[in-house]
A protein has these predicted regions:
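N-lobe entry segment of adenylate-forming
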Residues: 1, 21-22
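Short N-terminal or domain-adjacent regulatory/targeting segments
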Residues: 1-5, 50-52
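Nucleotide-activated donor-dependent transferases that construct or modify glycoconjugates
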Residues: 3-16
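Glycine-rich beta-alpha loop elements in corrinoid/cobalamin-binding modules
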Residues: 20, 26, 33-116
Length: 116
């Protein structure tokens, strides 16, 4: 199935992998609004499901989505940026976006450090 939007919630970094296992409510809320308005979307939650970036390939749709949104928190920002780079390579025609606390506070720094 081809999705309009693919949401990815990467695994937390290092020893924070078991810290407070909660789904990203932000992604769930955005998904609900998209569903109500007729957009197809899929959530790949590596954090809740316990998958790392090496296992991500098996969970992703084959066809490129139009938009990929990656959730980036203070606990997973390193993995989120690596995931964003990987997904930009896998889906070169998709618009890649990162949302969350870290990118809100230091967007210029992240854009300079990770220009993918």
């Amino acid at each position: 199935m081809k999705y309009d939007v693919l949401f990815v919630h990467p695994q937390n970094y290092g020893n924070l992998q078991t810290y407070l296992k909660l789904p990203s409510l932000e992604l769930c809320q955005i998904s609900a609004v998209l569903n109500q308005n007729g957009y197809s979307n899929k959530l790949v939650d590596c954090f809740i499901d316990g998958h790392d970036i090496q296992e991500l390939d098996n969970m992703l749709p084959i066809e490129s989505p139009r938009i990929v949104l990656i959730y980036c928190s203070e606990y997973n920002h390193i993995n989120a940026l690596h995931t964003a780079y990987y997904l930009a390579q896998r889906y070169p025609n998709a618009l890649i976006g990162i949302l969350g606390m870290i990118v809100t506070f230091i967007p210029e720094y992240l854009l300079k450090r990770y220009p993918f």
